[in-house]
Each structure stands twice: as structure tokens, then as C-alpha cells.
Amino acid sequence: MVDVTHTIPVYENLASELRRGLLTLAVLAECAVEQYGYSLKQSLSKRGLEINEGTLYPLLRRLEEQGLLTSQWQLADESRPRRYYQISPQGQAALAHLSVEWRRLSRALDGLLTQEE
């Protein structure tokens, strides 16, 4: 067995990079239903994808700038306005393409990882 205790920060950084790459796909998928930032964070968390606000909100802005999400301000019950995000038609096309690509890559990696065992 390999002692990795001294390299744990490296593994944490690699895992963080891997998650960051998947977040675009996850956010687009979750925004099929209108979501505001915190509800999206909670929804992703329930599915095992933790994301902090410092990552989520810039990602939402970037996806909106790219035309993959739309947003609108809405007044919630007796509270401050919330910005709700929803996938756009262009975002739906991107999600379909990314989903196919994810499945292809996942199969390839499964084959590689199974080969190691």
C-alpha cells in the first residue's frame, strides 16, 4: 500500500479540479427547473455535489453571458428579490451535447479504471 498522507493536499486539489469540470453540466441539468442560487446549491448538495458560493455565482454569471442560462429577478414571499436562473434553448442544446460527451468519457474512464484493478 502506498503512503499518501504527505500528498493529500495534491489529491484534494485534483479532486477539486475534477468537480469543477463537472459543475457546468450539473448546473445546466439542474436549471431545467427554475432555480435561484441558494436553491441550486442545496439541490446539488443533495445529489452529492458540494459547491461554494464563490464558485457557483461566477459560474451562473458566465453561463448566462454565454447564453446558456437566462435569469430574472422575482420577489419571493415577504423576502428580498431573488435572481432565478433557467436553462435557455441554447443551454439545452449544450446540455444534450455535454451529456453525450460525459457518457462517452465515463465509459472510457470506466474501462481504464477497471483495467487497473
Question: Where would I find each of the regions flagged by the language model?
Answer:
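Short, intrinsically disordered or compositionally biased N-terminal tails of bacterial proteins
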Residues: 1-14
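Short, structured secondary-structure boundary patches
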Residues: 18, 73-78, 92-95
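Alpha-helical DNA-recognition elements
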Residues: 62
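Beta-hairpin "wing" of winged helix-turn-helix
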Residues: 66-79, 86
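Amphipathic alpha-helical dimerization/coiled-coil segments
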Residues: 93-117
